[in-house]
Amino acid sequence: MKIKIIKYDGTEMFYDALSFEFRTNQISNWIKIKFNNDETIVIDNVCVIKTID
């Protein structure tokens, strides 16, 4: 699945991900993205997440 992420500062990022998990707390919103090669990254200060067909 393709994911578009927009951070609060306006930065846009695109990823081709296997899956993702979104979490929020009092400090920040963050997304954990897992890729097909078992690599995982975490991005914080996420404002918008959009999946693209």
Where are these regions (language model features)?
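Generic cytosolic/nucleocytoplasmic N-terminal low-complexity/intrinsically disordered segments
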Residues: 1-6, 31-33, 44, 49
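N-terminal acidic leader/helix
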Residues: 1-29
